[in-house]
Amino acid sequence: MNRVIYPGTFDPITKGHGDLVERAAKLFDHVIIAVAASPKKNPLFSLDKRVELAREVTRHLPNVEVLGFSSLLAQFAREQKANALLRGLRAVSDFEYEFQLANMNRQLAPEVESLFLTPSEKYSYISSTLVREIAALGGNIEQFVHPAVADALRERFRA
């Protein structure tokens, strides 16, 4: 069974992330969205809320599972018996960091391959950071995120 992990902070999960998950679900038997705790990034949403939102966005995909994690990614991949890590590349600027990360993960878990997908053109400019900034300033985020995520962002910035 081909099991792929798609790791990230997903703060929040965007339509760009969803696009990659949909495509991965067609390529792999089982897709695990691994939501990283990432305390150093000081996420807007709690780990539990980010997991909940990712589950809502992907509930129509039977071979997709969403799990939170706070360990080393290579260790988590082994625990989940994954044979691949999936990363998205939006632009050339993402490549250098992702290349270093892939090489480090190869050293830590040589049995787990790193694979890259580029987003559909209509999502290539979307980032969680930009979505948070637009939401914080009261802008329209509906075109960038699932309705449940838009609701969560509006509620968060109302508080």
Swiss-Prot record:
Q: Which Pfam families does this chain map to?
A: CTP_transf_like (PF01467)
What catalytic reaction does the record list?
A: (R)-4'-phosphopantetheine + ATP + H(+) = 3'-dephospho-CoA + diphosphate
Cofactor(s) listed: Mg(2+)
Sequence positions that bind substrate = 9, 41, 73, 87
Per the record, the major location class is: cytoplasm
Q: Where is this site: Transition state stabilizer?
A: 17
- Where does the record say this protein resides? Cytoplasm
Query: Which enzyme type, at the first EC level?
Result: transferase
**Binding locations of ATP:** 9-10, 17, 88-90, 98, 123-129
Q: Which GO terms describe its molecular function?
A: ATP binding; pantetheine-phosphate adenylyltransferase activity
Q: What biological processes does GO assign it? A: coenzyme A biosynthetic process
Q: What is its EC number?
A: 2.7.7.3
The pathway is: Cofactor biosynthesis; coenzyme A biosynthesis; CoA from (R)-pantothenate: step 4/5
Q: Which residues constitute the signal peptide according to the record? A: none
The protein's assembly and partners: Homohexamer.
PANTHER family in UniProt = PHOSPHOPANTETHEINE ADENYLYLTRANSFERASE
- What HAMAP family does the annotation carry? PPAT_bact (MF_00151)
What does the function comment of this entry state?
Answer: Reversibly transfers an adenylyl group from ATP to 4'-phosphopantetheine, yielding dephospho-CoA (dPCoA) and pyrophosphate.
From the Swiss-Prot or TrEMBL record, give the protein name: Phosphopantetheine adenylyltransferase
Source organism of the structure:
Azotobacter vinelandii (strain DJ / ATCC BAA-1303)
Biological classification of the source: Bacteria, Pseudomonadati, Pseudomonadota, Gammaproteobacteria, Pseudomonadales
